[in-house]
Amino acid sequence: MKIGVVTFPGSNCDMDMIHAMGHELQFDVVKLWHKSRDLDGADVVILPGGFSYGDYLRSGAIARFSPIMESIVAHAQNGGRVFGVCNGFQILCEAGLLPGALLHNESRKFICSNVQIKPVSRTACLTREIDDSKPITIPIAHGEGNYFIDNDGLKELQDQDQILFRYCDENGKVNPWSNPNGSLDSIAGVANKQMNVFGMMPHPERAASSDLGNTDGAQILTGLAALIEV
């Protein structure tokens, strides 16, 4: 099993992801450069958080045109797994690999805090093994995490079990007060119809080490590689 982590100009969570996947979870991890088209045999490609290309125009709008994205799109279209976290999620939406868009937070402020999320999809590899009877705690750090999609798109996400996580309170209840950024339907992450491309705003790589006092994110990252035969 080989995990590829992409570095764009402005990425600042790539090394965190490499540490979580390689040191903490013991996967074989390779670094992928935005100017390359070579995925170096990666079974799973991860687009980490940060501020790719300075978030000019809007988050992810320039990164989607990077040479590496041509290979990532082809990888996804061939059934390969792709995972975007925070800015990576924004890039995947801009590239059309995931439905919807990420808008400015409802508060118009950058938010950095721990939040509670609950798994929703019972189909996606990321979430199906996570206990849905209680929330998990994962950090967020974003200014444009307000997920939006039109009404038809939202219904399709719900009907096709494509919603990965919703923001919730510490008791697992979804309500307006537990939604940190105004995301429609309290959505914190989604998958594509084929269930091989995933995106979420919270940072599981920042909650994958007992040294940091939180390993809730490790089960998400482990699920990413589940059932892949190599």
Question: Which functions belong to the PLM regions below?
Answer:
Residues M1, D132-P135, N192-V197:
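Beta-strand-turn-beta hairpins that frame and shape the catalytic cleft
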Residues I3-G4, T137-A141, F198-M201:
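Active-site-proximal beta-strand elements of phosphoester/diester hydrolases
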Residues L97-L184:
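Pocket-forming structural segment of enzyme catalytic cores
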